[in-house]
A protein has these predicted regions:
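Active-site groove signature of glycoside hydrolases
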Residues: 132-135, 195-224, 274-288
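Conserved, mostly hydrophobic/aromatic
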Residues: 131, 212, 275, 316, ...
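Primarily a LysM-type cell-wall glycan-binding module
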Residues: 1-20, 42-69, 92
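Glycan-recognition patch characteristic of GH18 chitinases/ENGases
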Residues: 99-192
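Substrate-binding surface in catalytic domains of secreted glycosidases
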Residues: 140-147, 222-227, 231-349
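Substrate-binding cleft and catalytic face of glycoside hydrolase catalytic domains
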Residues: 94, 151-189, 197-205, 209, ...
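Short, acidic/polar
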Residues: 112-127, 188-203, 257-266, 380-393
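Glycan-binding loop/region signatures in secreted carbohydrate-active enzymes
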Residues: 166-181, 320-388, 418-427
């Protein structure tokens, strides 16, 4: 696999011919909606392991390496019969390696809204370890709202993907509710009821474990939250169920803000089997335009996290969506949420050139809509996902967690499968 950035006048025919593959292979690897139209700057997965370049007049290994964007030492390594790299002849076959041998195994979690389609499930299960089904919303009395997800659980298990039950403190208004969290965390009777309901659901619905996603907890509930997690772990562990906990992305222990203060990385890391760090939403619906998961910010969070949590417990969050902001942005404005496929198609629709922010390692573009309004779109693509896998490797993390898997984006799974051997925890 290589990642190719399209140039003006590029066509799939030209690209396929250059790399010795087929148009249909490129279309499939990228789920391209219209093979006749590409955006300038679009990052495409080219599904090839290596190609054979026939040397012509003026060729050098250096020029060949630049043409194919493959390091010179890799080309030399792939051609042991070349005794003098400075001396190649016309007509000589030069093998250019593109294959990535997965350097390590990894766990991949995918958050799935319960209405995920059967087709999408079949597309994503080869690349997942866990499927965390979102979500059981808890009530103030310890009961939970009903979730109709048995078919998703069954499909996950049928494809050796471990289903996780997700519980949240999402209130009746549809947002994370601090007061609801406070009630649950400070009433032992309510906790006992909730834990019994969780255990019953795990058993009756054939879940593998539970994921706790309590957000916007009051800072004063920090210790109560840890006590609840410990109590939950003690209740489910004897039955073989696992506990994962989703936490906000922090840079330091004492980071202020209701999103962060109740999430004690060290204490949670001691209790949970896995910690899912939600490293996304720097750019968010109601915020100013920016990358959703900037590489530099994500890396800073992970560099702190591994000092508090065992790296082999950490699943680093990656977003699978895009935002479109109307400019100029004013406080109170909201962005339109898109899928990554929609973001790329919109760039093509308006003839926008896709740009690359090297600090954030994220793609974006500007366009003018039919009403004359200027927009900026930030999204994820093969190149940005590839950069994120470097963080997983560099810090030796357990793996990655996708929010969400409901909208299939082929390049995400291509990057995962070319970088990692996906671990299975059930048969």
């Amino acid at each position: 696999m290589i990642i190719y950035t399209t140039l003006p006048q590029d066509t799939l025919y030209k690209i396929a011919n250059k790399y010795g593959t087929t148009i249909s292979a490129i279309v499939g690897a990228n789920a391209i909606s219209n093979p006749d139209k590409l955006a300038i700057g679009q990052n495409l997965i080219i599904p090839v392991d290596n190609i054979k370049h026939i040397a012509k007049r003026g060729d050098t290994l250096y020029n060949i390496s630049k043409y194919y964007d493959v390091p010179l030492d890799k080309i030399i390594e792939a051609n042991p019969d070349i005794t003098n790299p400075n001396n190649i002849y016309i007509g000589q076959a030069i093998y250019v390696p593109y294959g990535i041998t997965p350097s390590r195994s990894a766990e991949i979690n995918g958050y799935a809204i319960a209405n995920i389609s059967q087709r999408t499930i079949s597309q994503i299960v080869p690349s997942l370890t866990y499927m965390a089904i979102f979500s059981y919303q808890v009530r103030a009395d310890g009961s939970m709202y009903t979730l109709y997800e048995q078919n998703v659980i069954n499909e996950a298990r049928a494809n050796t993907v471990a289903p996780l039950m997700v519980i949240t403190n999402i209130g009746e208004s549809g947002g994370f509710d601090s007061d609801l969290g406070h009630t649950i965390l400070n009433d032992e009777s309510v906790q006992n009821t909730l834990i019994n309901n969780i255990l019953s659901t795990l058993q009756n619905k054939n879940y593998y474990g539970v994921d706790v996603d309590f957000e916007f907890l009051y800072p004063e509930d920090r210790e109560a939250y840890i006590a609840f997690l410990r109590k939950l772990k003690d209740a489910i562990s004897p039955y073989g169920y696992t506990l994962s906990v989703a936490v906000a992305p922090k840079y330091r222990d004492n980071q202020p803000g209701i999103l962060y203060e109740a999430h004690d990385y060290y204490a949670i890391g001691q209790i949970a089997d896995r910690v899912i760090i939600m490293t996304y939403e720097w750019g968010y619906v109601y915020g100013a335009p920016q990358a959703i998961a900037p590489y530099n910010e994500v890396r800073e969070v992970i560099s702190y996290a591994v000092t508090r949590i065992a790296p082999n417990k950490i699943l680093m969050g990656v977003p699978n969506y895009a935002y479109d902001w109307t400019l100029p942005f004013n406080t109170g404005d909201s962005a339109e949420t898109l899928t990554n496929n929609q973001a790329i198609d919109r760039a093509i629709q308006y003839g926008a050139n896709i740009e690359w922010d090297d600090k954030a390692k994220s793609p974006y573009y500007n366009y003018i809509d039919n009403n004359g309004k200027t927009h900026v779109v930030w999204f994820e693509d093969a190149r940005s996902y590839q950069a994120k896998t470097d963080i997983v490797r560099d810090y030796n993390l357990a793996g990655m967690s996708i929010w969400t898997v409901n909208n299939y984006f082929a390049p995400l799974y291509g990057v995962i499968n070319n970088n990692f051997d996906v671990i299975r925890v059930i048969e």
